[in-house]
């Protein structure tokens, strides 16, 4: 699932 981490990047 896609989720934006604390850095604002997209992680799969």
Curated annotation (Swiss-Prot):
The modification Pyrrolidone carboxylic acid is found at residue 1. One of its GO terms (biological process) is neuropeptide signaling pathway. PROSITE patterns: GASTRIN (PS00259). It is found in: Secreted. Keywords: Amidation, Hormone, Neuropeptide, Pyrrolidone carboxylic acid, Secreted, Sulfation. One of its GO terms (cellular component) is extracellular region. Belongs to the gastrin/cholecystokinin family. Myotropic peptide. This is Sulfakinin. The lineage of its organism: Eukaryota, Metazoa, Ecdysozoa, Arthropoda, Hexapoda.
């Amino acid at each position: 699932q896609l989720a934006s981490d604390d850095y604002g990047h997209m992680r799969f």
